[in-house]
Amino acid sequence: MVFSSVSSFLDPPINWPQSANPNNHPHHHQLQENGSLVSGHHQVLSHHFPQNPNPNHHHVETAAATTVDPSSLNGQAAERARLAKNSQPPEGALKCPRCDSANTKFCYFNNYNLTQPRHFCKACRRYWTRGGALRNVPVGGGCRRNKKGKSGNSKSSSSSQNKQSTSMVNATSPTNTSNVQLQTNSQFPFLPTLQNLTQLGGIGLNLAAINGNNGGNGNTSSSFLNDLGFFHGGNTSGPVMGNNNENNLMTSLGSSSHFALFDRTMGLYNFPNEVNMGLSSIGATRVSQTAQVKMEDNHLGNISRPVSGLTSPGNQSNQYWTGQGLPGSSSNDHHHQHLM
């Protein structure tokens, strides 16, 4: 198969050093003035470059390309001016919307938005954003911190007060109830001291000395009560106050069914009758004395009788205890005293 269109090429010469020199190479490429590339005697590429007869023509075309429409230039300048104005902080100090203080400063743009400048008030220590809602939270959340501190202080103060109250209660209350001792006195609180009873003779009472058995253990014998004339009859020799239930005060009261001022058989006799009564002894000698009581017929039922042992025989004979239990001198017109 033969291709007639394929051109045959001659092999390059064997002399390589000579072929390296373009001057010696018969097929070297040359660039002519008209812009055509020739190789040896054969023209390989023919291209005619445009010639520039006017050298100022290139500068005119560059100036025309850089020329901008005045309308578009004005729009871009306005946009750049607006952005520059928004990016700059507001001039002057703005008044705080809360306290109207001028001691404010510009901080930054909220969320990097140029339309939301954020300011800080040094007076009330709060931020505010132009166009945003006002927040009452100060810098660092001071309100919340103060609330926690106050609640903690109140709790600690209440706990300390509770501890102090409990300590005071423990200090005042006795540790053991067995250590509490009742301070008992041998004499009753409603009775005067018995040592000065003999000195009452100057006012007309003429009370004899009473030899009471005052024990140091807080027990009072029944003779002490008999000496005072409170009880008549019955065996009350046991202690009045003590741990023995059989000899306590209630037992002594039960055994003594009546007082010395009233007779046991008082309601069994008529008023004109005379009753001989045996009175209890007084003191250590236990001297028994009998007194005859004359009971007169009286509508009021007044009873006059001497108190045995409390009136000396040598003193006035008209002293007695009235029915009301009050000492006084009798009137000779109404009552008479007879001593056996």
Swiss-Prot record:
Renumbered zinc finger spans (Dof-type): 94-148
InterPro entries listed in its UniProt record: Dof, Znf_Dof
Main localization, broad class: nucleus
Binding-site residues for Zn(2+), renumbered to this chain: C96, C99, C121, C124
Positions of disulphide bridges: none
Alphabetic keyword roster: DNA-binding, Metal-binding, Nucleus, Transcription, Transcription regulation, Zinc, Zinc-finger
Pfam families: Zn_ribbon_Dof (PF02701)
GO cellular component: nucleus
Location(s), subcellular: Nucleus
Region listing for Disordered, in residue ranges: 12-33, 138-180, 301-340
BP GO annotations: regulation of DNA-templated transcription
Residue ranges with Low complexity bias: 151-165
PROSITE patterns recorded: ZF_DOF_1, ZF_DOF_2
An example molecular function term from Gene Ontology annotations: DNA-binding transcription factor activity
Entry keyword Lipid metabolism: no
Top-level taxon: Eukaryota
Biased composition (Polar residues): 166-180, 309-331
Biological role: Transcription factor that binds specifically to a 5'-AA[AG]G-3' consensus core sequence.
Name by which UniProt lists this protein: Dof zinc finger protein DOF2.2
